[in-house]
Amino acid sequence: VEKAAGRTVEETVEGAGGKTAGGSRLGTREIVLIGMFAAVLTVISQISLPMPTGVPITIQLFGIALVGAVLGWKMGFLATVVYILIGAVGLPVFSNFQGGFAVLAGMTGGYILGWPVMALLSGIRPTWKSKTLNLAVMILLALAGMMFVEFTGAVQWSRLAGDQSLSAIMAYSFVAFIPKDAVLTVLAVIVGTQIRRPLVRAGYLE
């Protein structure tokens, strides 16, 4: 998975002129980290509890927020996009070892398609003097990303379900998923911040 992810990032960067959104080139170190965390998402995605509704309870949003908090917004976004791309081409990286475009077009596909935005928001790091304030803002941004995922997922679910309205699905999500996802998101930002520090000191991240 890491090798496939690395190739995908290189192809994506070359197609965009060899640069990231911030204008800096991706080096081997960055590509390796992106591939590694795409692999981390693959592992986390297999942890799920099936539900009668067809939408499993997972800790995937923990993984998305973690990737953003550790890698930062650019690399976190790319790692999530790479994960989705390698799943879309058929590798079994989605939950329950599924793969293929059909997963993205299915009932839960809207949630997956919202993940890059959540990773991006989770990776924005304020640079104010107060570390507590910085962490609080990171958590709020990650929670905003989580709500974006819940909304995009509910939109696609409602369109495919036909007999369920968007408001009904969101109401159900507020009861069944959002409280759990919010706790996991907050935890992921805190844990991710701690993981990032030694990586920065070692020179793997800036």
Predicted regions and their residues:
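Residue-level signature of transmembrane alpha-helical entry/exit and packing/kink sites
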Residues: 26-37, 57-64, 76, 107, ...
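Interfacial helix-loop-helix junctions of multi-pass membrane proteins
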Residues: 91-97, 156-171
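Alpha-helical transmembrane segments of multipass membrane proteins
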Residues: 41, 45, 87, 118, ...
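Hydrophobic transmembrane alpha-helices
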Residues: 2-3, 11-77
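Short helix-perturbing small/polar motifs within transmembrane alpha-helices
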Residues: 18, 32-36, 43, 101-149
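Alpha-helical transmembrane segments and their cytosolic interface
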Residues: 1-36, 168-206
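Alpha-helical membrane segments and adjacent membrane-interface helices in multi-pass membrane proteins
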Residues: 45-122
